[in-house]
């Protein structure tokens, strides 16, 4: 499966547009981990804890979006966009959207 942020796939022709595919993933953060991450932020370092949570959310959302595209008969997803939202109580949401297409 080709997954790209561009609206075309170089060297490929789009045969069919199969529709918009989207996936939402909500992840919780641990209170102790939040506290330790805030200490890292205060002393000016990078928060590896949150970076790994963001990466986990991104990968899960893309995987779910690809699964939905596969069910539509797509072999590529173009125009992929990732959005992250912070929800209350330490929750984070990652949304992946794109257009499922068939390329040749």
From Swiss-Prot:
InterPro entries: UPF0145_dom_sf, UPF0145_YbjQ-like. Gene3D superfamilies: Hypothetical protein apc22750. Chain B (3.30.110.70). Pfam families: YbjQ_1 (PF01906). SUPFAM superfamilies: YbjQ-like (SSF117782). Belongs to the UPF0145 family. This is UPF0145 protein GTNG_1265.
């Amino acid at each position: 499966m080709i997954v790209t942020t561009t609206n075309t796939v170089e060297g490929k022709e789009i045969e069919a547009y199969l529709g918009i595919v989207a996936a939402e993933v909500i992840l919780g953060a641990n209170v102790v981990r939040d506290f330790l991450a805030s200490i890292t932020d205060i002393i000016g370092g990078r928060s590896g804890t949150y970076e790994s949570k963001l990466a986990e959310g991104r990968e899960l959302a893309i995987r779910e979006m690809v699964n939905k595209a596969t069910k539509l008969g797509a072999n590529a997803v173009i125009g992929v966009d990732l959005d992250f939202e912070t929800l209350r109580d330490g929750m984070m949401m990652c949304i992946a959207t794109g257009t499922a297409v068939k390329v040749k």
